Amino acid sequence: MKTALHSISYSGSWGQAKLPLEEIVQRASTLGYDGIMLAGKRPHASLLDMTPEVRSELRSRMTDAKIEMSCLAGYTNFTADAEHAEVPHREMQIHYVTELSRLAVDLGGTIVRIFTGYEQPLRPYSKAWDLTVSAVKECARRAADVGAIIAVQNHHDLAAHSDAFLMFLKAVDESNCRAAFDAWSPALQSDDYLTAAKKLAPQTVHTTIADYVRVPRFRYQPELVNYRRDEDYIQAVPMGEGFIDYRGFLKALCDHGFDGCVAYEMCSPLRDGNSLEVLDQYARKFAEFMKAHFAYSRSGGYSLHAMK
């Protein structure tokens, strides 16, 4: 396994500090990561801005910093805008993923992470499923033409559960369409994510990690002089302080064939604030967690066989 720092963590998307891409590359190196996961949108690796010259310069910076191009993160929703069928949203997104595949290869990588789709009332589940399977299948075929791999993340509504996710990958049925299987999603669903990891490990090429605690919420009802339980708020915390057993999750993946990239992201408001110092503290804590539990070599990454 090798580690990557997700650039979205320093994008300012949730009110946190924002850094340009070149500074994140250097930060990933300084904080002890093997590579970087680049957000395929502004303010980072947007196709609108990644000219041939910018690509060449970024690849040189990564080489100088000894940082690998671990994954290019695409942002897709293949069920979007059911109200306006005349707009070719899926075609535009397939083209977007195709060009991200070219960008990933230009930067020295192969993996492009994508999402499925969100459910919406105007599109029946079976129709949404078929449309998304078809779109991802075409993305995979076009990515294969340029030497890239599509990695579907269990993030959006469609195929969010681990069983549905496995069914989805089987429905796509393309050799270069693999899994970017994460623990946090099944953990929030109260799914058995350790068992799921064992099932999905052979297809998993990438996983993204963030740790959370549950914050209980109650709403006061004066007519009852009592409280009603609401859904918990999920709060991001430093690695190892949350309720997800990431040591067990990574072991389950590796025991069953995974040897890919483990990325760390800060993709929601953090418990300790949004300053650059806090972002660095969280990113450093993840690198320390990996070194505390797995033996490491620069050439081979983190080894399960020498778990500490």
Tell what function each PLM region has.
Residues 31-42, 71-76:
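Short, conserved active-site loops that position catalytic residues or coordinate cofactors/metal ions
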Residues 44, 83-91, 236-240:
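The substrate-binding groove and active-site-proximal loops of carbohydrate-active enzymes
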Residues 37, 71, 113, 151, ...:
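Conserved beta-strand positions in the central sheet of alpha/beta enzyme cores
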Residues 44-46, 79-80, 119-121, 156-159, ...:
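Short, small-residue-enriched loops and turns at beta-alpha junctions
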Residues 1-32, 108, 159-181, 185-308:
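Histidine-acidic metal/acid-base catalytic patches
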Residues 37-59, 117-123:
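Glycine-rich, proline-tolerant flexible connector loops at the mouths of alpha/beta enzymes
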Residues 1-12, 70-83, 116-119:
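N-terminal small/glycine-rich loop or linker at the start of catalytic domains
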Residues 22-26, 61-68, 80-179, 304:
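Active-site acidic/histidine proton-transfer and metal-coordination neighborhood
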